């Protein structure tokens, strides 16, 4: 099974060519939308390493990375993409769909940011890991009235809005994302993520 490994970032040296398959399988297990991921990771047979250097802007660097990954994954006939530093493992088809969105002018945040889930005190939570790569706080959202998928979709929309702008929000500020979705922002320190975050709640 071919895997494209995103092995290094600007201003760093490329790592050895081996992959920790056990660690990769653990990361693959945490993608609930890629059911075949863990099996593919465990059966890994070969890989290509992709790195981007010399691009100063984080958003622009990830734009370039996505374009290169799509080209390599297509020509290399890869089945999955592994970004260990970002806790991401997803399918080739998913990458190509995200690259198509990029061509249409959208930021493919799901190919750049990890979105995780957990439950606590009768509520579902969704959170990000990877916003720090862009100099932004991580995001959290919680609700006892919405499904995990609804939380996921809301957080994706806010992450896209956050990376597309240079805005900073005050505590309690309302962010209108579209006619159907408005979120209230609460900056805080998250004991779960152990970092400063923006905790989001639904307006209604």
Q: What is the meaning of each model-derived region?
A:
Residues 1-23, 39-42, 167-180, 186-188:
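Long, low-complexity, Ser/Thr/Gly/Pro-rich intrinsically disordered segments that act as flexible linkers
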């Amino acid at each position: 099974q071919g895997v494209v490994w995103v092995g290094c970032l600007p201003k760093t040296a490329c790592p050895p060519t081996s992959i920790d398959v056990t660690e990769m399988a653990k990361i693959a297990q945490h993608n609930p939308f890629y059911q075949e991921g863990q099996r593919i990771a465990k059966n890994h047979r070969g890989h290509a390493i992709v790195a981007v250097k010399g691009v100063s802007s984080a958003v622009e660097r990830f734009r370039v990375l996505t374009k290169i990954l799509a080209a390599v994954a297509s020509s290399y006939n890869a089945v999955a993409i592994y970004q260990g530093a970002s806790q991401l493992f997803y399918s080739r088809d998913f990458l190509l769909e995200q690259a198509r969105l990029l061509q249409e002018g959208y930021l493919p945040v799901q190919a750049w940011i990890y979105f995780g889930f957990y439950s606590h005190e009768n509520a579902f939570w969704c959170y990000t890991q990877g916003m720090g790569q862009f100099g932004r706080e991580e995001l959290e959202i919680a609700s006892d009235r919405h499904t995990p998928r609804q939380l996921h979709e809301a957080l994706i929309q806010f992450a896209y809005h956050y990376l597309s702008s240079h805005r900073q929000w005050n505590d309690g500020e309302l962010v209108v994302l579209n006619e159907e979705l408005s979120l209230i922002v609460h900056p805080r320190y998250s004991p779960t993520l152990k970092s400063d975050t923006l905790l989001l709640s639904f307006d209604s």
